Every structure is written in structure tokens, then in C-alpha cells.
Amino acid sequence: LVLALSNGFNLYMARMQTDTLSAYPLSISESSIDLSSFNEIYESDVAEKYPELDNVFVQSAFEKLIGMLKSNDLSEEFLTYLNEVDPELYYSMQYDYGFDMNKYIFTDISIDSETPQLRVDNFMAVDTVIQMIETVYTMIGAIPPDLAAMGVSTSFVRSYVPTMAEMPAKQLIEEQYDVIAGTMPSFAAEDYNQLVLVVDSYNNISDITLLLLGYIGGSMEIGKPLAESFSFDGTAEISFEDLVGSKFYLADNAAAYPYDDVRKTYKNNIQPSGADTSAFEELEIVGILRPKENVTGVLDTGLAYTPALTARVLETSEEAENRAIIDAAKNSEKGSVPVLNERSGQSTAMSVRTLAGDPTPAKISIFAKDFDGKNAIKAHIDAWNAKYTEEDEEYIAYSDMMDMMFGMLSTMVDAVSYVLIAFTSISLVVSSVMIGIITYISVVERTKEIGVLRSLGASKFDIANVFNAETFLIG
């Protein structure tokens, strides 16, 4: 019974792993942390417990923390080798180039605040809108002092406000999502301007997300409970027709970060609503996606774009008018250039990578089709690593979060199973001994009955069968 339960739970975990395979892809990052050695940080370097010495020993925790940091050289040679993996093993090999698409996609936003007096009616990047929301949280004291003391800041807003996300391969999206309005984007290079809106299984999407993405104007009143801080013209439902066809705008570096000749600095592009958008490329929502039943989708709710849009941003960054800010960052001593946010008055350091000026990927996410495929891909990378040691620059460290998480869970289940099997075995031994004792006592106490049976012609074999039957029934 215990083995059956253990086997059943292992099968359940395997099914869970299959369902969540796309949520935790195999990843290779330019820089990463080796979580597998996390438990070693506070392991003692002293061999003997409770030493009889008048000394305090210092652990090398900082050195171990530094040792957990891994750098990968995602060279052209390795990328060529990685692309030799059989395409039938994975849905998509997604490249992240280290820039935020939210800084390049613009929308009209309308916010009207009574306390303090604030009227925002601008054409700006989605990322700038997120910064405004973070500022509002600061102004209304949304972070309790006890949480602030623990290091919690308004940056958590970004993790709760899904904005722009890149979709992996079309095949994976078609397997996990239904198109409930409009069409599925083509994923072709020339159709980089196609976006989709992703809703949850209830057709829900956050009202804050709608505000950030500029679907409808909002009224924001500082000091009200957070649940009442935003109101959208009394509209609780929006038809598919109003959403499909919504326009957004793609900026290149020259449009996103114009140079201010007066202040001699680059700045975020913020214009009045209805401003000239001829310097921008038009994007359009072509469909609405909803996850299929019993499927853990790879996308969060919000807007999603195809890899073709990423390729388009990298392509435009190579044009002469867009290279100025990239060259300024490349030629600076710090490797970055300050960009002024006129609304907050603060500057942000932008590097070559965050300006979409580096065509080398910062992270690679591989969405395997199944476990056999994932293991084959890992074996392919291991074959590359076999030529090097972990200290070599060419050695590639990859992360398999799902394997680590379920591996720990499987170890725990195995440990519980071993304990239960041990208890069961002990119970079985004790029961066998007790049955033997009962049988022995039964034979000793029933000698007269045995004598009667023998006198009636019963053989020893017949009498043994009687007692064996009783023992079997007792057992």
C-alpha cells in the first residue's frame, strides 16, 4: 500500500512537471547564481564539533557567496553549437537581449488627481507610466513602515502589473491558448507590429494594466483606499471589439531618448496627447488569447508581442540616427549614459545593452517539448562542458529550476516512503511473531482435541491444515 501511494504520488509529480514544463524553461544567463550550492554557504570549515579550544573560527560565507556567482561567455562559437540541437526537441529558443520593451512602446495616458492637484494627459512610454504609479504609491504611503524597514519598496509594483512580454514559438502558444477574439499573430518578421491581449480563464485583466496600457482614461485620487484609487468612467466591462484594433506606438532610440540641447543631456520622450507620432511605428492588437482548460500558460495577463518585434528594435538600433546615444554610452568611462526623466527630475544610467545596442543575448530560455527533449538538450550542453573545467571561461552553467524544485520534493517523498516502509516492515515482523506465538499456544492448549482427531483417523497433515487455516484467518 505504501509503495503504491508513493508510486502514485511520483506519477502525479511527473504529470505536474509536464504541465509546468513551459513555465520553467531551461535557461542560460550571461550571469547567474548557482542555487544548488546555496546550502553550502554556512557549512562549517571546522572538522570537529564542540572543539575544546578558546578560539572563534570565521566562516568564509562571503567567499562562498562570491563563488555562487557564475558568468557565462555566450560566444558566437557556443551559440552556433547550441543551435545544432535538433529543433524537434523544443518549441522555442528565446533570446533576451537585456533591454526593456516597455521603454520603447508608447501610449496615450490620462490621469486626473485631486489630491495633490495633478493632471496628466500625455503620450509616453509604458515604463514611464509604471514609474508614475510607483511614485503614487510612495506619496500615499502604500508601503507600511515595518515592511519598508525590511527593504520592501515600490518596485514590487512592477511584479504585479503585467505589461509587455515576448511570446515564445507560435506552436507553443497555439497549444496553450484559445483565440477568443481577432486572430493569432503570424509571427512573421514583416508582421512585427502585431500584438495580442492575454486574459485569464475568467476573461479578467487588471484595471491598472488597462490604465498603464492606455485603453481608457483613469481618475486617480490620492488618499483613497487602493481598491478605490482608480475608476474608469464607471466601465467594468469592455467589449472585445473595443480592445481588438487598439493602437500603440514603437519608438526607436532617437524617438524614445531625444537629446536636449539646452540641458546637454538625453531625456525620456514625454509629449502632450495627440502629438505628432510620425516618428513612431504603429502597433496593433490583432487578437485576444485565453489559456485553455487545465493548462498552465507561459504568458501572464497583459500585452504580448512576437520575437519579430524584438528583432525590429535591434535592427533599428543599428541605424545611424539611433547610434548616437549608444555610442555615447559605449565611449563613456562608466559604460553608460544618463537619461533624464523630466517628470521626476531624476536621471537613469542607460548602458549599451539596455539601449538595445548589443546583439549578443544576455539570456537564453529553451522551451522543451517534453522531458526527454529537455534531457537531450542538457546532454548537448554537458558535451560542450566536457571539454572544459568549471573555472574556464568557456564553461557554460545552465539553470533548471523545475528540476531542482521537483528534485527536492521527490527526495522528501522518498524519505517519507522509506520511513513508512520501515514502520510497515516492523509491524509485519511483530505481527508474524505474534501469530506464531498464538499458533503455538493454540497447539499446546488443544492437545486433547488433536488426540480426538487422530483417533477419528485424521492424519498429521490434516491437523496441520486445520491450524494453518486458523493462522491464515488470524493473519
Give residue ranges: language-model regions.
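Solvent-exposed loop/turn and edge beta-strand elements of beta-rich ligand-binding domains
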Residues: 1, 66-72, 137-153, 344, ...
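Alpha-helical transmembrane segments
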Residues: 2-27, 31, 35
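Transmembrane alpha-helix boundary/anchor motif
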Residues: 4, 8, 433-438, 467
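Peri-transmembrane interface segments
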Residues: 5, 9-13, 46-47, 154-160, ...
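Helix-start (N-cap) segments at beta->loop->alpha junctions
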Residues: 32, 201-203, 254-255, 290-293, ...
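Short beta-strand boundary microenvironments
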Residues: 37-247, 251-254, 258-264, 280-282, ...
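Short beta-strand-centered aromatic/proline hotspots
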Residues: 267-290
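Transmembrane alpha-helical interface segments in multi-pass membrane proteins
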Residues: 419-430, 439-440, 448-475
